[in-house]
Amino acid sequence: MTATPANSGSNPRKFSEKIALHNQKQAEETRAFDELMSDLTVSRVQFQKLQQLRLAQTRAQYYGGSLPNVNQISSSPNDFQPSFHPMDNIRGMRHHGLVERVSRNRLHSSHHRPVEKHGRQCDSSPYGSVYLSPPPDNNWRRTNSDSALHTSASSSKLQDAFMGGNQAMLRAPKPPQRNPSLQDGEMNNFGEAFSYPTSMTEENMLNVTKPLPKQIWEAQKVQCITSRPRSCEVPGIKVFPSSDSNASLSHYQGSLNTGGSLPDLTNLHFPSPLPTPLDPDDTVYANINAENSSGLPAAMTHLGISNSQGIQNTCSNPSIQATMNNNVNNHTPPGRNNPTLHPSLRLSSLSNPSLPTSALGSSPRRRHTPVSPLTLTPGSESNRSISNQFSPTSPMDMLPNSQGVSMDRCPLSLPPLEPPPPYPLYTDQPQPQLHHTQQQMHESPESQNFQPPSPVPCPPLDLNLANSSLSGFFGDSFFDQQQPTKQGKYLWQQQEQYDMFGSPSSSLPNTNAFFDPNMNLQYSQASLMGLGGSHGSLQDSFHLRPNYLYSNYGGSVPNIILTDDSSNSLSKDISNAVAGVSELGFDADNTFQFDDELKLGPLSLDGLSMLSDPDMVLPDPSIEDSFRSDKL
């Protein structure tokens, strides 16, 4: 009997079993504890998530980062309490994240701080309410994203659910009315809607009925559009909306809830700060169709010239472009002749409509617009079609108008869509026939084959430009009457070389020009190098000497070769141009003839001795002046 307890006490098997049982029990306790702690952790996390979701719904309108509403501060401490009540909710929710603030709109809260403290804080503020930023309304967001919209919609419903706590404290509600200036309105804790631009008086606080959170939400969705977008508000800037701000409501429709923080500017069309665009090629007017791609660029707008829809092509008159910038507003009366214009103004060509305007690609300052003289019509003259002034079946014996012709008989151009009729070939005639044709045209100025259009006023040109461009066009041998026959032969060689008209019936199809594209390309190059830029560039750029319609510039000699007597309009133009040149002082009889030395003929040795004799008394002092004028 005594051996058994000793054996049992010294048995290591039983001891190890006890240890195993102890470890098993400890492991079970540890497992139970871990399960309990995990359950607590899961429940705590779920509770925190639930609380955060609830707090997010109640605090959604303060997620914009706005400061507490201090615009409703007044002298009475009772007004301080509701104005700082949202700030206390924010502070309480930040420090006590798990504490649920359900009735945010109640007057008294368990975590509300004493009123006197807020009163002391606000009384010490050096700023008044007018210096503070406008309060954001309850639908103000940083963004208009879907999540923010969902939160704002849900928060408005929660706000309606918790309005029951204040109804006992509210005054008797008045009929529903909206403050017309309620654009930056704010719901305070009483449910009253305040308007920022108006003064915070007790009378204004009584003008709005109490249960209006949903009304403000739905009304301000439309009405706050008339003010600036919320993302454009600067806290330190106060904007007073005008009384007629609701008139522009339809202009901002569609700019709400576009999914971004920036305002929707798709409906706003801001005018260009520049009066004219930088590149005139981008603003060719819509009423100038593709047939005249040479068009009227925006430089015509600077000149004050209105373009007409009936103009199908324009005359390129490079020698008058510089003057048009100065004299386009000085219109001459209708029917007035301009006899002082020189023949270089006749040497114009039609712009080739098949060549784009970009072929004249120079800078806007340098390039001058090819302008038809007939586009200078003021008033209602420019708004009607001038291309109908021709009879479509009449023979086109007259080509585009020159500035030297009387403006009451000048047509614009050929019909735009028809190929030009046959034009008579140039014939080899000497230049003195010019005077013969002038006499015929002065005798019968009315014998014309085209219908005379209505009088069109034309701006007067500058005579200084006429002198400079005349010397640039004609050089030093145009009026040299010593070689008329040589000029005629040379011009005919020029005519055969360029061959502007292959046959009497030849013409370019679908164009309004009587010349080949190569000629127009040369003219475009001349325009690119500043043909009409300034007075001096007229002479410098004429090394190109492009082939014009009536002038093949082979050197300095113009190609003025007349046809038969039936070309009345052409001869009339040349006669008027030569008459204008004679008035300018370029008389063909005595200007360019080098016979100044022949004026010494009346003088003799006796006359020279009379001049050298100091004792000799002249009968008239004007005789000595006349000798001095002859450089003696």
Curated annotation (Swiss-Prot):
Highest taxon listed in the record's lineage? Eukaryota
Give its localization. Nucleus; Cytoplasm
Residues modified to Phosphoserine: S66, S133, S145, S293, S372, S391, S556
GO terms for biological process, alphabetical: cellular response to cAMP; negative regulation of adenylate cyclase-activating adrenergic receptor signaling pathway; positive regulation of transcription by RNA polymerase II; protein homotetramerization
Segments of skewed composition (Basic residues): 105-115
Regions of biased composition (Polar residues) lie at 310-338, 372-405
Report biased composition (Low complexity) as residue ranges.
145-156, 339-360, 425-440
Q: Does the keyword Signal apply?
A: no
**MF annotations from Gene Ontology:** cAMP response element binding protein binding; transcription coactivator activity
Skewed-composition ranges (Pro residues): 413-424
Q: Region Disordered: start and end of each range?
A: 105-156, 310-455
Keyword vocabulary terms for this entry: Activator, Cytoplasm, Nucleus, Phosphoprotein, Transcription, Transcription regulation
Q: Function of this protein?
A: Transcriptional coactivator for creb1 which activates transcription through both consensus and variant cAMP response element (CRE) sites. Acts as a coactivator, in the SIK/TORC signaling pathway, being active when dephosphorylated and acts independently of creb1 'Ser-119' phosphorylation. Enhances the interaction of creb1 with taf4. Regulates the expression of specific CREB-activated genes such as the steroidogenic gene, StAR. Potent coactivator of ppargc1a and inducer of mitochondrial biogenesis in muscle cells.
What quaternary structure, including any partners, is listed in this protein's UniProt entry? Answer: Binding, as a tetramer, through its N-terminal region, with the bZIP domain of creb1 enhances recruitment of taf4 to the promoter. 'Arg-300' in the bZIP domain of creb1 is essential for this interaction.
PANTHER family per the record? CREB-REGULATED TRANSCRIPTION COACTIVATOR (PTHR13589), CREB-REGULATED TRANSCRIPTION COACTIVATOR 3 (PTHR13589:SF4)
Protein family (similarity comment): Belongs to the TORC family.
What is the designated name of this protein? Answer: CREB-regulated transcription coactivator 3
Query: What is the primary gene name for this protein?
Result: crtc3
